[in-house]
Amino acid sequence: MKAVIFAYHDMGCQGVQAVLDAGYEIAAIFTHADNPAENTFFGSVSRLAAELGIPVYAPDNVNHPIWVDRIAELAPDIIFSFYYRNLLSEEILHLAPAGAFNLHGSLLPAYRGRAPLNWVLVNGESETGVTLHRMVKRADAGEIVASQRVAIAQDDVALTLHHKLCQAARQLLNSILPTMKCGDIPSVPQRESDATYYGRRRPEDGLIDWHKPVSTVHNLVRAVAAPWPGAFSYNGSQKFTIWSSRICPDAQGALPGSVISVSPLRVACADGALEIITGQAGDGITVQGSQLAQTLGLVAGARLNRPPATSGKRRIRVLILGVNGFIGNHLTERLLNEENYEVYGMDIGSNAISRFLLHPRFHFVEGDISIHSEWIEYHVKKCDVVLPLVAIATPIEYTRNPLRVFELDFEENLRIIRYCVKYRKRVVFPSTSEVYGMCTDASFDEDKSNLIVGPVNKPRWIYSVSKQLLDRVIWAYGEKEGLRFTLFRPFNWMGPRLDSLNAARIGSSRAITQLILNLVEGTPIKLIDGGQQKRCFTDIRDGIEALFRIIVNDGDRCDGKIINIGNPDNEASIQELATLLLDSFDKHPLRCHFPPFAGFQVVESRSYYGKGYQDVAHRKPSIDNARRCLGWEPSIAMRDTVEETLDFFLRSVDVAERAS
């Protein structure tokens, strides 16, 4: 059987040798040229191929039609990929009659994506493995041929685990390749519900947050220990790297980041202390912890810090229009937690962002985007990333004020998009899950699902089509005029500071705020058309983390992309949401300050929203794009979100109002 192999790294060498030992003919090997900036501690596939007398190539783009044709001329029966770093096109995958197969460094479907070796250590896993699977268009998603488990010892670091995985891979290939050569190829579909995705790790991801649990910090040290770039921190302006550590349970009440002792060198974390066994100051040599403390001039009680702001590198300027809104104020908080971001914002109010007004990297102007066009144009020109978050996004307004919805959501935002085109600025635009309308797909795919809305005489759809039309305009500007953009589609984000109870009193709020108002005032909870409509509720913290990663745009992977941001696992009907909320309300310590529960009341949507309303039975996102582009996965359970949101609103009610 003739094989074409795509391979790199130690795993690539193991794979090539295993294929030869199994009696395959290798027509050619495709690999990568080594990057001079990378620590190439691993074996060379190109050198191995040359020594074996096998043709070897390292094209910049193996998916180019010229290379696809050359591979086709080789007429492979089967294709193998062993740690080749680029995805292969469907044209290449279809060239081999027996199929194309990839060796992945985890027990799929867990830890799809990049750097699974490091991520399993970061997350403190006790087991991983290697998996041979059939290659399909989606990375790491094809049917499983074979897998082998690998136990992770508590003293394993990245390099020792790497060696274990290489050994396991060789054992796996030695057992399965002869069987495959005879045409017997097992195939077990992956369980998508168990799939997790992780993105590429960068050297800067090794920055230690001393406010994390000590186990988290220790696992980070293990995950990026030499020959990887290492976990690091700062003493003043001096960077130092920790190469090995151990956990000490007692932090002696010290604040996170405080040096507890210098011999041994121990630093307080959130719930314990990290003992630094070996480390390195700057570009110096590796020394034991106590000598590192001496080199850095550390004394007991000193505080380690985050990296100093780099004077030679300008901070990234982010313009947020609608900064006082639900997404805007939470995003501002996330950005200001990072030293290299500066936030410029405008909104008609400042109640939700009052906590930032004195922050030196937050610049706010109170104003209306429909009036202050000169200020907006100037700041679009001045900033690096623009987020036009201003919109009317409450369903009752779609039928009550459809023209105002169109004027603000489409016309005013179109002007801002044109400024971004004019000054060649990147825009991160909030599309909406509403654009999918009455789509019948089980889960809504950004690139494939049809966008289906009702008839013109149903003004309820004016928000959806305004957003959809702007999505299409932005896409066209990207195609024709080079606008850098990302469209993100939130699916029912919830959390503190979502709307207000006053907005709920006039019916202009999202569902959970309205339900909380009913509980606070002792009025019946209204279930529109019985409350059987299903939504996927997403915690604001999960949503903001995904949005932050879009702004970071690692490797420009978000450019020109549409990304759903939602939690498919948190699907519930409005009735189920109300029941969960009521249960949390009854258990809340402030429950005694509010009236008795007034029951549920089923009402027709027309009587509640008015003429021209249509509802949607379900709305579940596919989040494959978010997993692939962001390395993001939602993690917060719906009950936690409901309890935190309820607590925020109950504590915001005035004491006098509670008593009444």
Swiss-Prot record:
Q: Which residue positions does UniProt flag as site: Raises pKa of active site His?
A: 140
Task: Map out region (Dehydrogenase ArnADH) in residue numbers.
Answer: 314-660
This protein's GO cellular component annotations are: membrane
| Keywords associated with the record | Antibiotic resistance, Lipid A biosynthesis, Lipid biosynthesis, Lipid metabolism, Lipopolysaccharide biosynthesis, Multifunctional enzyme, NAD, Oxidoreductase, Transferase
Site keyed Transition state stabilizer: positions? 102
> Can you tell me which residues bind NAD(+)?
347, 368-369
Family annotation (CDD domains): Arna_FMT_C (cd08702), Arna_like_SDR_e (cd05257)
Binding residue positions for (6R)-10-formyltetrahydrofolate: 114, 136-140
The record's catalysed reaction(s) read: UDP-alpha-D-glucuronate + NAD(+) = UDP-beta-L-threo-pentopyranos-4-ulose + CO2 + NADH; UDP-4-amino-4-deoxy-beta-L-arabinose + (6R)-10-formyltetrahydrofolate = UDP-4-deoxy-4-formamido-beta-L-arabinose + (6S)-5,6,7,8-tetrahydrofolate + H(+)
The catalytic residues are 104 (proton donor), 434 (proton acceptor), 619 (proton donor)
Query: Which family does the record assign?
Result: In the N-terminal section; belongs to the Fmt family. UDP-L-Ara4N formyltransferase subfamily. In the C-terminal section; belongs to the NAD(P)-dependent epimerase/dehydratase family. UDP-glucuronic acid decarboxylase subfamily.
- Known partners and oligomeric status: Homohexamer, formed by a dimer of trimers.
Protein name stated in the entry: Bifunctional polymyxin resistance protein ArnA
> What organism is recorded for this protein?
Salmonella enteritidis PT4 (strain P125109)
